[in-house]
Amino acid sequence: MENYGKAVTFSSSATSNLNTGKAIAQYNADAKLMAEFEQSRESGKSFDYSRSVIHAPQNVTEEEMTAYLSRIQRGGLIQPFGCMLAIEEPSFKIVGFSENCFDLLGLKSGVEPPERMSLIGIDARTLFTLSSRASLAKAVASREISLLNPIWVHSKINQKPFYAVLHRIDVGIVIDLEPANSADPALLLAGAVQSQKLAVRAISRLQSLPGGDIGTLCDTVVEDVQKLTGYDRVMVYKFHDDSHGEVVSEIRRSDLEPYLGLHYPATDIPQAARFLFKQNRVRMICDCNAQPVKVLQCEELKQPLCLVNSTLRSPHGCHTKYMANMGSIASLVMAVVINSSESMKLWGLVVCHHTSPRYVPFPLRYACEFLMQAFSLQLYMELQLASQLAEKKILQTQTLLCDMLLRDAPFGIVTQTPSIMDLVRCDGAALYYNGKCWLLGVTPTETQVKDIAEWLLHNHGDSTGLSTDCLSDAGYPGAPLLGDAVSGMATARITSKDFLFWFRSHTAKEVKWGGAKHHPEDKDDGGRMHPRSSFIAFLEVVKSRSLPWEDSEINAIHSLQLIMRDSLQGIGENYMKSVSSPQQNDSDGVRFYELSSMALELVRLVETATVPIFGVDSSGLINGWNAKIAELTGLQANVAIGKYLIDDVTHEDSHETFKALMCRALQGEEDRNVEVKLLKFGNHPTKEVVYLVVNACTSRDYKNDIIGVCFVGQDITPEKAVMDKFVRLQGDYEAIIQSLNPLIPPIFASDENACCSEWNAAMERLTGLVKCEVIGKRLPGEIFGGLCRLKGQDALTKFMILLYQGISGHDTEKLSFGFFDRKGNFIDVFITANKRTDERGNIIGCFCFLQTMAVDHPQISARDIEDDRECLSTLKEFAYIQQQMKNPLNGIRFTHKLLEGTVTSDHQKQFLETSEACEKQILSIIENMDSGGIVDGNRVELKTEEFVIGNVIDAVVSQVMIPLKEKNLQLLHDIPDQIKSLPIYGDQIKLQLVLSDFLLSIVRHAPSPDGWVEIRVSPGLKLIQDGNVFIHIQFRMTHPGQGLPSALIEDMVRGGTRWTTQEGVVLHLSQKLVRMMNGHVHYVREQQKCYFLIDLDFKTQKPRSRESSMDTKAD
C-alpha cells in the first residue's frame, strides 16, 4: 500500500526513512525561522511570525543550517543567575569562563585582575576552599560524573556556597555554579532528600491511579509538579506524529488565560531544541528579561564551547520574545522521554510558567527530573495498554466484519452494523464494487468516488492501496472540488478493479481551542509570537490536511483487505445471494473448535505456570489448583478440589483477608498484591505456612456473569522467613548484617539521606565491594550507577523509587534489578525495601534485601568436573554397545526380509510392517547415538517421507502391549478412519519414537489392576503456508488417577544437567524432538484423569522446492 503526504508506510525501514525526512524538513523550517528573526532584529524591522511559519521553506543553505545549530548549541551566552567555568581534564586549567565569575566568586574583592582574560590558564581549584577542591577532584575522577551532581563548594574569597553542576564536553569539563541559599552542607543534603521524598509521594500517587486513563495521569502530574515548584501555570505538552504540539493538561492560577487544548506548529519548539531536551531533560529560565552573560574562552579553541548540557545556557532571543509576549517571565521545562525497545522518543514536555522571576534550586529540579522519569515509565505502560485495547477493538470489529462477509459478501460490511467505518477513525467510508458505490458518512459523491477509483487505477495500478492526509499532495487533480469535507483518504484494493475507501475531513474540524472563546476570531497582530498566533498559524498549516493515518489503522485496513480478497474469490459478477446455511454451520463448527482449542490451551498454560494459581466458586469451594500451588502446599489437586478455601486450606490469620478479597471480587472489584498465608500439608510440621502475595481476579462465564474468584500468587516464603527473623531481633540486627553464613541473603541499609549505612558480607561477595568502600556513599548514583554500573537511566529511576519509598515508610513490591559488579559481570536480582525505625518508631532509613536469580557455588564446579569424567566413561560404554547392537539387528532385518516372501494374509503383512517399523526405530536410535544425538544438542536429521498415521499407531501400540497385559490394563482408542489412512509427510520414525515414549509413561503410571489407557487422535484445521498445505493433528494419551509425579514433569519441561529419573531424561528428549518438529507437548491434570497432549502440523502434499530431508538444530 502506497502512502503520500504525512502518512506512514507499512515497512519499518520505510517508516524510519520517512521520519528522518520529516525531521530534516523540520530542521530546515526551524533554521529559516531563526534566520529571519535574527535578520529582523539586526535591521530593526518587525518579525512576522505567522507568515514565517506558514511559508516555511523545504530547504535552506548549508551555511544557514550551520549557523542555526551553532546558535542553539554553542551560543556563547549564559543566564546571569550563576557563573560558569570550563576546565581541562585532569589539570583543572581554565579554558573558558563567564564574565560574571568575578562578581559571584568575589574575585573583585581580592586582587583585581589586570585584564578580564586573566582566568584563562589558571588552576580552577585555587578559586575554592580546600574541602571544595577535594570534592571537585573526586567528582572529576569519577567515571559517571553527572551522577554525583550537585557538588557542594565554597568560594575561597567570599566563602559563598554554590551548587557545582559538572558535565563533560569535547574539550574538557563544564562547571556550572549556582548560588546556594544555605551555608550548611547538612541542610543541603537534608533539603535534597526532602525533595526526593516529596517526589516519591507524588510518584506513589501516580502509581495508585487506575490504569487506562492517560488524561488523569497527566492531570495528576501537573498538580504534583505545581505543589513541588510553586509555578503559576503547569502544562503537559504532547507532540503528535507530525511534530506539532498540543496542550493536553493544565493547572493554572485562576486569573491566567487557559491554554488547555491549544495546538501549535512544530516550529514553535524547534527540532534542535527537542534534541537538547533528550540530552538535558530539565531546562530552567529564571528571568527572560535578564541580560545574558558572555562566555570568554581560550583562543586556541577551534569553536565556541558546547553548552548543550549546561544548566545556565541562555535561551535564544526568539524564545525570550515569545515568553515576554505571553506574560511569562520564568519557566521550567521537563522532558517526557519514553524509552521503548526500539529507540528513545521525546513524547512531550511538562512546562511550568511564572509571571515573575523564579529560581528553583538544583536539588528540587533533580527531584522533578526524578518525578518525570517515573511519569515517563507510567505513561509508557499506559500507552502500551491503550495500544493493546485499540488493537483488541480493531480485532473485535474485524471478527464481526468477517462474520458479515460469511453471510453477505461483500455488502454486509457497508449495509450492517458495525460497518467498515467502525474499523478505523474516519468521517466517511465507501465500497466501490462492480462499478457501483455504497457510501457511508461524509464522502465524495458517487461520481467523485468513481473518478478517484479511475485515478488510482491509472496512476497507481501496481499498488494494492494508498493512504494520504492530503489528496492534493498525493496528486489527485479533483482534490480542490472536494473542499474541506474530504482531505485525507485511505484505500484498499480488494479485486483488480474494486476498492474500499475511508475518508477524513481536514484537521481543523477536530481541533478545539481551549482558551477564551473570542481568541480564535481576534483580529489582533497575527505576526506577534503568542499562543494565539501559534494556534492560528497551526490552523493555516494544516489547512486541507486531515489527521495522519496511524500504523495500527493502516495495518487494520490491510488485514481487512486480505480477508476481503479471500472472501471474494469465486464470487462471480452476478453473485448476490447469501451464503448457504450448511456453510454457515461449517463456519460455526470451525469457530466452536477454535474456542475449544483456546480453552484447552488456557488450561494448559495455567497448569504448567511457574506461579501458584488457584480458584474458588461463588460459595468458596476450590475449583482450580495448579501444579505450583500443589507443590508449595503439599496438597495435590485431586485432594484440594472441593475443599473450602478459607476453612480447610487458609491459615487462621488470613481468614478475614480472604473473605474480604472474595467478597470484593464477587462484586467485580479486584485487588492486587495482598499478602496471605496458606497451610502446608503432608510431612510438614503443623505450624508451617506458605506466604503468598496474590492478585484476586473475577471469574466469569460465557454470559459475563461472575461465577467465582481466581487467585494468581507469588511465593514470598523465603523472604518472609528472613524478615520474620529480622523483626524478632527487635533492632539488634548485627547477627544478620555481620553473619558470614552463606544462607543469609545480600542485605544493605540506607539512612534517611539515601546514604549506605550497612553492607553485609553477602553484599561484599555479590558486588566485590567491601563495606568500608561504600559506607557513607549515596546509594543511587555513587554506589549503584557509579561503583556498580547500571544498564540505563530507567534502572536507576526504578531503584530510586523503591529506595525512597522504603525511606518514606511506604510498602514496596519486589523489583527486578540488575547491575554490574566490580569485575564487570552483570548481576540479576530481586530487591525489596523495608523501613528502619528506632526505638520510638521514627523512620531512620530502610533495609534492602536482595534475592539473586542464579547463585553460583564453587563446589558445583568441582562436582561438574567429576560428572564430566563419569560421562566420558559412559560414552565409551555407549560406543561399544552401539557397535554390538548393530550386528544382531542386521540379522533380524535379514530374517525379516526372508519372511516377507512367505506372507499369505493381510494380518501377517500388517504384523511384518509393524515389526519393520520397530526395527527402523531401533536403528534410528543407534544412528542418533553415533552422531552425538539430541542429548548433547547436536544436529539430528529429520527426514521427510510419505507415511500414514495408522502404521505409526500400530507400531506405537505394539511397544506397550506387554506392559499393558502385565498390569491388566485396558487399551481404549479413538482414531477416525480417515486419519488412519491419511497420507502425510514427515519423519515417521521420529514421530513413532516420541509417541511410544509418552504412551509408555502413561502405561507405567496408570493405576492397576482394572485400570485403562486411552489414545485419541484428532484432526484440526488445514493451513496454507509458503505454498504448502499443513494439517494439524493432536494426539491425546490419557489415564485415570493422580498422574505422573511432578518431578517427572519438571524434568520433561525444564531439563538441565541433572534429572530426577531416567524416565525424566527420556521424556525431556522426546519433548525436545517434538519441538524440533515444530510441535508442542503439554501434560494436563484433571480431577479424575491426566493426559499428554501432543500437537503437530504435517504436510499433506509433497513439499515444494524443498529438500526431502533437512538438518534441524536442537534447542
From Swiss-Prot:
SMART domains, A to Z: GAF, HATPase_c, HisKA, PAS
Report quaternary structure and partners: Homodimer.
Matching entries from NCBIfam families are given as: sensory_box
Q: Which GO terms describe its biological process?
A: detection of visible light; red, far-red light phototransduction; regulation of DNA-templated transcription
Q: PANTHER family given for it? A: OS08G0260000 PROTEIN, PHYTOCHROME 1
Protein name, UniProt field: Phytochrome E
Q: Please report the stretch or stretches of sequence annotated as the PAS domain.
A: 598-669, 732-803
Query: Can you give the residue ranges of the GAF domain?
Result: 213-383
A GO molecular function annotation here is: phosphorelay sensor kinase activity
PTM per Swiss-Prot/TrEMBL: Contains one covalently linked phytochromobilin chromophore.
Keywords from the named record: Chromophore, Photoreceptor protein, Receptor, Repeat, Sensory transduction, Transcription, Transcription regulation
Q: Tell me the organism.
A: Ipomoea nil
Name the residues that bind phytochromobilin. Answer: 318
- Cite a single Pfam family from the UniProt record: HisKA
For this protein's source organism, the top of the classification is: Eukaryota, Viridiplantae, Streptophyta, Embryophyta, Tracheophyta
Per UniProt, residues of the PAC domain are: 672-728
Q: Which residues form the Histidine kinase domain?
A: 880-1100
Known function: Regulatory photoreceptor which exists in two forms that are reversibly interconvertible by light: the Pr form that absorbs maximally in the red region of the spectrum and the Pfr form that absorbs maximally in the far-red region. Photoconversion of Pr to Pfr induces an array of morphogenic responses, whereas reconversion of Pfr to Pr cancels the induction of those responses. Pfr controls the expression of a number of nuclear genes including those encoding the small subunit of ribulose-bisphosphate carboxylase, chlorophyll A/B binding protein, protochlorophyllide reductase, rRNA, etc.
The text of the family note is:
Belongs to the phytochrome family.
Alphabetized PROSITE patterns for the sequence: HIS_KIN, PAC, PAS, PHYTOCHROME_1, PHYTOCHROME_2
